[in-house]
Amino acid sequence: MNQLEMKKVAAKAALQFVKPDMIVGVGSGSTVNCFIEELGAFRDQIKGAVAASKASEELLRKQGIEVFSANDVSSLDIYVDGADEINPQKMMIKGGGAALTREKIVSSLAKNFICIVDSSKQVDILGSTFPLPVEVIPMARSQVARKLVALGGSPEWREGVITDNGNVILDVHNFIIMNPIEMEKELNNVAGVVTNGIFALNAAHTVIVGTPDGAKIIE
């Protein structure tokens, strides 16, 4: 079973959490795209969805699912998203698709944050396999990069990428994140940082791992 097939296994398993009349929160990325395709079969049973990226909004509309703004809802029953890395405490690195800020906003509305991944995304320590994305106000890019170097990282500007919020992304290599909560707080306090891709303060509640043997659900 290849990686895409394992993503589809996880995406299909997440459908069991979708109930009638829900507004479903969805993130962004390749695994979420699989979920949105599956969610299309529920278009007449759910009220709609709140998406964390413009790309996901477009896919939802193609499936005939009504799209709501985060400002339209006070809470969500579920939020379904992928991750670039996830540790045993259900803390994640996200932001490979540059939608990390909106993902934090929408996921914070959810009673149940469901993370769907294939088994390659599971790590013991965050930062082991994937650089940490940091969304930065454009005028602060160099200043923030210097601060990240001082903290022990090796930031790389993701040239040509502009977020849905009009900002830029620095991908920080060589961060081995032993204390994700403290690191998330520290980086978010750097002037010019909008947010960083550590999801530790708002970790997942449920993890669904797609494996060759089927979906493994961790609650």
Curated annotation (Swiss-Prot):
Substrate binds at S28, G29, S30, T31, D81, G82, A83, D84, K94, G95, G96, G97, K121. It comes from the Bacteria. The keyword Isomerase applies. The active site is at E103 (proton acceptor). It catalyses: aldehydo-D-ribose 5-phosphate = D-ribulose 5-phosphate. Its EC number is 5.3.1.6. The keyword Transport does not apply. Keywords: Isomerase. Pathway: Carbohydrate degradation; pentose phosphate pathway; D-ribose 5-phosphate from D-ribulose 5-phosphate (non-oxidative stage): step 1/1. CDD domains: RPI_A. InterPro entries: NagB/RpiA_transferase-like, Ribose5P_isomerase_typA_subgr, Ribose5P_isomerase_type_A. One of its GO terms (cellular component) is cytosol. It holds the Pfam family Rib_5-P_isom_A. It is an enzyme of class 5 (isomerase). GO terms for molecular function: ribose-5-phosphate isomerase activity. One of its GO terms (biological process) is D-ribose metabolic process. PANTHER family: RIBOSE-5-PHOSPHATE ISOMERASE. Belongs to the ribose 5-phosphate isomerase family. Homodimer. Catalyzes the reversible conversion of ribose-5-phosphate to ribulose 5-phosphate. This is Ribose-5-phosphate isomerase A. It comes from Mannheimia succiniciproducens (strain KCTC 0769BP / MBEL55E). The gene is rpiA.
